[in-house]
């Protein structure tokens, strides 16, 4: 986290050739608002797709007021409510719609044990939480983001990608480590193929 917090726009400039050549760029709100803004502003020049994870309620405030340059926004209910200044009683669907109205191209709104609401301006989908023998929640949110992006990059639909991310989060919940030691594409593919729910 310290490395992300110390990242500057100058650092982005130094590595711009690599960044600009990417199909996707992932940033989270551990970086400064200035770095997030630079990533968003340069998206149209470099033609990468930008995915952003809000990380926490306080850090979600680093998101820009308009989300038009964010192709995939990962955010939980508390972060969304705080960012939007919404009532904590707002439904996941209402929060997701409000984030889409702020310009996000797609939203992945996590709701803990109640699953995920995801979609774009045309439709929202609810993905139920995948049952897991919970050992530790550490790393589960990161796993959901990683699994979702992995499948989006492979060409899956958003709902299919989020389902893969939810499966990866469930696998992560079942270990005491933030990254499961036996994690592999084959393990995740097997879990998805078995329809583990």
Say what each PLM segment does:
Residues 28, 53, 79, 136, ...:
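Acidic active-site catalytic centers that drive phospho-/nucleotidyl reactions
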């Amino acid at each position: 986290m310290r490395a992300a917090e110390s990242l500057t726009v100058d650092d982005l400039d130094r590595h711009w050739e690599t960044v600009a050549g990417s199909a996707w760029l992932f940033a989270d709100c551990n970086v400064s608002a200035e770095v997030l803004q630079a990533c968003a502003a340069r998206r149209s020049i470099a033609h990468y797709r930008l995915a952003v994870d809000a990380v926490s309620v306080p850090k979600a405030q680093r998101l820009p007021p308009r989300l038009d340059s964010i192709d995939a926004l990962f955010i939980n209910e508390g972060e969304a409510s705080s960012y939007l200044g919404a009532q904590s009683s707002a439904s996941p669907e209402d929060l997701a719609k409000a984030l889409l109205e702020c310009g996000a191209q797609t939203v992945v709104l996590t709701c803990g044990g109640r699953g995920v609401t995801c979609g774009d301006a045309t439709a929202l989908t609810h993905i139920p939480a995948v049952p897991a023998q919970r050992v530790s929640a550490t790393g589960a949110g990161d796993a959901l983001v990683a699994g979702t992006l992995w499948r989006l990059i492979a060409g899956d639909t958003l709902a299919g990608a989020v389902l893969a991310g939810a499966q990866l989060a469930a696998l992560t919940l079942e270990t005491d480590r933030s990254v499961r030691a036996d994690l592999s594409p084959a393990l995740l593919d097997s879990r998805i193929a078995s329809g583990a729910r």
